C-alpha cells in the first residue's frame, strides 16, 4: 500500500520504519499551506493517508477531508481521553474552522469517518499498549419524536404513548 503523510512537523519518520514502501510525506511551510499539501495528495495514488497529529482545527479539517475522498482509509493521532471526547473535539474543530455551521451536521460527518478508536496508554516502564478499541457505529435517526401522548386523557394513557414513542 502506498502511504501519504501530512504533518505539521516531520516526526513520524516512517521511511525509517518502512524503507521499501512508497511513501509521500508533506508538511506545511510558510509558503505552502497544509490544505495545498492535502490537495496534491488527493491526486496521487495513495492507499493510506496518515495525518501526523490532529491538534488544531485546520488539521482536523484535513483529516475529515482525506477520510472522505482521498484514500482507502485514514489514520491519525489525537489526544482525546475518551471516544465521546474525540467526537466532540473533532466536531468543534469543524465548526471553528468554518467547515460546518450546524453542530448536528458536523457531528454526523465526523462520525461517518471514524470507524475505530484505538486508544493507547503507557505502562509504568513507558511502553505503549492498546488500552481499548472502540468501534464507531453511526446511529441512523429514522423516526421523529411525536407528541401523541399529549392528547391522552389519563396518566396511564400518557405514559403508555410516551414509552411507545421512546422505544420505537
Where are each of the predicted segments found?
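Switch/coupling sub-region of P-loop NTPases
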Residues: 1-109, 121-122
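Well-ordered beta-strand positions
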Residues: 116-118
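NTP-binding/hydrolysis catalytic cores, primarily Walker-type P-loop NTPases
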Residues: 125-168
